[in-house]
Amino acid sequence: MQILNRVLLVSFALAVTSLPAAPSRVPIILDTDIGTDIDDAFALALVINSPELELLGVTTVAGDTQARARLAAKLLWEAGGTWRKVPVYAGEPEKPQPIEQTRWANGFTSSALHRSGAVDFMKSEINRRPGRVTIIAIGELTNVAALLKSDPSMAKQIKLIALMGGSIARGYAPDSKPEAEWNIKSNPEAAQTVFSAGVPLLMAPLDVTAMLQLDAAGRHRAFTHLTPLTNALTILYHLWGNETPTLFDPMAVAMLIDPSLSETQQLAIEVDAQGFTRVVEGKPANATVGMRTDPKRFFEFYLSRVAP
């Protein structure tokens, strides 16, 4: 009997060790200018509903960064549970501009909300997990450039920068020429720092984002899902005040989770003084760049997570 028990124990141990390991979550920091356009809030909602990602924290950039941080922190609060403990750090404030969506978070407070310290937070988390942290940058690249300038060793410690920005073969309108995209042209110098730093880049330019317009059926599905998080998105959508949102920023998140959502090319990209992202022939590639996507498939992916 003892021999049989030993055989069974050994067999069980072998069976357990032969099971495939659970996929590890990707630690990320979301750097965002949430509150101006509506797509940042939709991107954060996708992060919250993606178990493949481990959100270490949110940092805010551009204009009234403290108001943006309050908005991000309240959206996380609405998600409930441990999301309420995810730290949110404001970046360096710039000249404030009116941001309608931030009215929703006026007066909101939380122990997870920090009025400054975005770059220091990034550096601390990356130092704790060298070579493992991905930054998802969906605003201008001011914070990321400041991080790289403050400590050049960061370039070798960041696993990846996934960003929404740039324009390769088309602009905002269908069949339009490439143009200076907002996140890049808002701070071309910062973008130049990031693109020349040697950090691997995953780039979601206008080529795979400008066509991602959430139609009436998609909006109805999202806004009638009636969770606290989708209810918050509904309120922010109405404060935003336009009809059809283009989900630029969620694509940067989606490409990280499921690379098959976009056809990509390995390209050498440089940023000029006007904020154009130029393809440079004959140089080693510094970016994996989204070139084509299927909007229907993207929205099936997005809504299956945020409003299943």
Feature locations, PLM:
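Positively charged n-region of N-terminal signal peptides that target proteins for export
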Residues: 1-6
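Active-site histidine-anchored catalytic micro-motif
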Residues: 23-34, 38-74, 83, 110-205, ...
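Short, hinge-like loop/turn segments at secondary-structure boundaries
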Residues: 74-77, 220-222
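Bacterial N-terminal signal peptides
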Residues: 7-18
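Short, well-ordered secondary-structure micro-motifs
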Residues: 99-101, 172-174, 214-216
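A glycine-rich helix N-cap at a beta->alpha junction
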Residues: 75, 79-89
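Conformational coupling and interaction surfaces
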Residues: 24-25, 43-50, 54, 182-308
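Surface-exposed loop and adjacent secondary-structure segments within mature catalytic domains
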Residues: 86-113
